[in-house]
Structures are given as C-alpha cells and as structure tokens.
C-alpha cells in the first residue's frame, strides 16, 4: 500500500513538469551565462586554447575530442573558430568558470601548477607555473568580469584588487 502511494505521489509530481522543459543550469558555473562576457571570451580567451606552448600540445588538440570540456573542432583549414563555434565553446567553458571566484573556477585551477595555486587535476599537464602568467591572468580577468589586462596582485578566492 505504501509503495503504491509513493508511486502515485511520484507520478503526480512528474506530471507537474513537462518533458519538453529545458533543463536549468546547475552547479557553480550556473550564473556564468549572464556574468561572463562573450566578446572578451571570443577575442582573448579562445586564442589561449589555440596557443602553442613548449612541452605541451595546444589545448584544442585534446579538448576538441574526448574530454569533459569539449571545444568545437576547427573547421578544415581554419585558424580559429567561427561565430557559431565560438558561442558553443563559450557555453562549454563558462561551465568551468565561476564568476568572481578564482579558486572555484576549474578553468583556472586545473591547468595551474599546484605550487602556484592550482589543484592536482589536469591530465593535459600544467600549462602555467604561476598565477602571474599572462595567459592565466587573461583567463582570470574574464572570470572577474574585467575588460582590460589588469594584473592580479595576489591569488585569493574572490576577485580582488588589481594593479
């Protein structure tokens, strides 16, 4: 009897939400859609994913294949992404960025050396030894909602003062 009542209750609750409803974003990056700037992402953040670094492959080499942060593959012969691909990349990357939170943003801590403030995880290696690296600073400025090239003077949890 209790099982039947429980099933009836669950069925009643499920009918309140149509199957065609769009899922709501959840998790730390859920507010990122409104807080992060697409144009800054397109012109300053995306080029970092294409940059060649000594001792490493380009981010796009791995992140356009079987990784959770999957970027769009470049079109044949293209040197960068088109508008539609950039918007898809933006959606993927913003889920790894927590606006105004440097140490909660996987985008910032995964590829940063642990001794420099990063975490242990990033199977693609550590691309930056310090949060003072110019590329890392560009990513941090995006997460902090800054439009310029302000330099962070210290690595804290929240976006703080700049030079």
Predicted feature descriptions by range:
Residues 17-163:
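Aromatic- and Gly/Pro-enriched helix-to-coil junctions and flexible linker segments
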Residues 4-15:
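Bacterial N-terminal signal peptides
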């Amino acid at each position: 009897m209790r099982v039947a009542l429980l099933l009836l209750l669950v069925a009643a609750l499920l009918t309140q939400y149509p199957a065609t409803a769009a899922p709501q974003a959840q998790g730390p990056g859920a507010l990122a859609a409104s807080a992060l700037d697409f144009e800054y992402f397109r012109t300053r953040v995306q080029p970092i994913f294409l940059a060649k670094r000594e001792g490493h492959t380009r981010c796009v080499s791995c992140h356009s294949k079987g990784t959770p942060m999957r970027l769009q593959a470049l079109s044949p012969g293209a040197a960068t992404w088109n508008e539609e691909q950039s918007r898809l990349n933006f959606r993927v990357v913003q889920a790894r960025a927590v606006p105004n939170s440097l140490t909660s943003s996987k985008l910032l801590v995964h590829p940063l050396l642990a001794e420099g403030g990063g975490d242990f995880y990033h199977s693609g290696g550590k691309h930056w030894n310090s949060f003072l690296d110019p590329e890392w600073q560009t990513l941090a400025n995006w997460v902090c909602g800054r439009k310029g090239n302000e330099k962070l003077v210290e690595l804290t949890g929240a976006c703080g003062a700049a030079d």
